[in-house]
Amino acid sequence: MTSETSDLLAPLDLAFWHIDSDLHPMHLGALGVFSAHSPTAGAHAADLLAARAAGVPGLRMRIRDVWQPLLPLAFGGATRETAPDFDPLDHVRLHAPTSDFHAEAGRLMERSLERGRPPWEAHVLPGEDGTSFAVLFKFHHALADGLRALTLAAGVMDPLDLPKPRPRPEQPTAGLFPDVRKLPGLVRGALSDVGRALDIGASVARSGLDNLSNRSSAALVAEPTGTRRTAGVAVDLDDVHRVRKTVGGTVNDVLIAVVAGALRRWLDERGDGTEGVAPRALIPVSKRRPRTAHPQGNRLSGYLMRLPVDDPDPLRRLARVRTAMDRNKDAGPGRGAGAVALLADHVPPLGHRFGGPLVKQAARLWFDILVTSVPLPSLGLRLGGNPLTEVYPFAPLAQGQSLAVAISTYRGQVHFGLVADAEAVPDLDRFAAALTAEVETLVAACAL
């Protein structure tokens, strides 16, 4: 049995699998917009996606429960395995032409992925005017995080002329029934894990107590409705670099400050007020080890910070974001409430299976809004010869929350992908407009 045909889910993957529900599906998405060479380009793209998907091993993987009596500490886990009846036409769908890609994407993001099949979909949305089409990719977070989803999606794009990577050393796979002689070592490792988990848990608890005196906003809280709305904003990356070079910090600092300023504008326009408002933002951090031979699964931690929504000065907001991010980086991704994802590594599979409902209900206690960045290659991607011009990433929406923000940079543009509960945030377009206005405000402030 090779690693391409079966591999056990990493702890965080298993956690995402078991907190999934119809009201809060744990799939991430990406809406790619392509310039079309002809009115039939969308239909041709759907044919290409179906034909190429069969040749991407990761897209053939389904998730199946596995009970392992020979490994009690992994009892109740799950595995990725090649689906013997895989049919790409079950996953690639061509829709009727539309004039609003995001309106269609919002409705499609509402729908959970079918758990008995490889958990991904590609929805092709032809534009009504025939000059463009979009593809909405959906991947369950247990199948792929943002980085792996990018790799899988790139596998069905037009091939690029790139240097061949150096071969990686082959690693023997453990299989589903490991050597019994290894059990004593596994037990010692599990006991050590308990100690590390207690350290992380203490960090989470301390950080949570530190944040009790601050205030979020009712606009960021929502009872589950199962509805979704999406929006996208593109801004010039040169403008972001102009701000960074003037004020200092990183591109990510500037983008987080843009989100804080946009929230301030949006809340004030709604009449909700921003005095004393500083919502907790979770900033995910990848902990993948580079260039390993075996799939690692999701390896995430995160930084938790208060967004300075209450501050009326845009440059001061940016300075406060820089200070908070520098403090988080100095402490490392294993400290604070953002490290809660690391606890998944120290919970046995049965804990994820039965504790998932409790974990998803506790999300609002840890953070108020997710702000995540998804790296994209600077190379121009094409599908059927049609160039990819825009990419809007979509993050899963945590239970109890109304809004999530994902950010990518591609070909000189920054793309903000917004996912919201459609009933709680009927004015998502106003928040999208506030993002553009905030970039303009920062650029103007730096010119003074």
Q: Where do the PLM segments sit?
A:
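TRNA-binding/sensing appendages of the translation machinery
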Residues: 21-28
